[in-house]
Amino acid sequence: MTAKKSLTIFDHVLVPEHRVLSKEETEELLKKYNIKPSQLPQIKTSDPAVQALDAKPGDIIEIKRKSPTAGVYYYYRIVVED
């Protein structure tokens, strides 16, 4: 009997790494850039990555993107209801 491998959206080569920031990390991020959560780009709860992370509205997602020209950079989005 062969075991089935469970795949997630993050296994796809084109999907960058996502993670939910802790409360402390969120506070540091907002302080560092002197911004409010409402000033961040939004990501909806229906997004497959948000669902895979089990993120809730108000959570901030850090997206780690890799680029051949820019190297590694981070992008932040706040989770909002559909």
Curated annotation (Swiss-Prot):
Organism, as annotated: Thermococcus sibiricus (strain DSM 12597 / MM 739)
KW Phosphoprotein (keyword) present: no
Protein name, entry field: DNA-directed RNA polymerase subunit Rpo5
Stored PROSITE patterns: RNA_POL_H_23KD
Transmembrane spans: none
InterPro entries cross-referenced by the UniProt entry: Arch_Rpo5/euc_Rpb5, RNA_pol_subH/Rpb5_C, RNA_pol_subH/Rpb5_CS, RPB5-like_sf
Leading EC class: transferase
Matching Pfam families: RNA_pol_Rpb5_C
Alphabetical GO biological process terms: transcription by RNA polymerase II; transcription elongation by RNA polymerase I; tRNA transcription by RNA polymerase III
Key words of the record: Cytoplasm, DNA-directed RNA polymerase, Nucleotidyltransferase, Transcription, Transferase
Assembly and binders: Part of the RNA polymerase complex.
Cytoplasm recorded as keyword: yes
GO molecular function: DNA binding; DNA-directed RNA polymerase activity
EC number(s) stated in the UniProt entry for this protein: 2.7.7.6
Localization in the cell: Cytoplasm
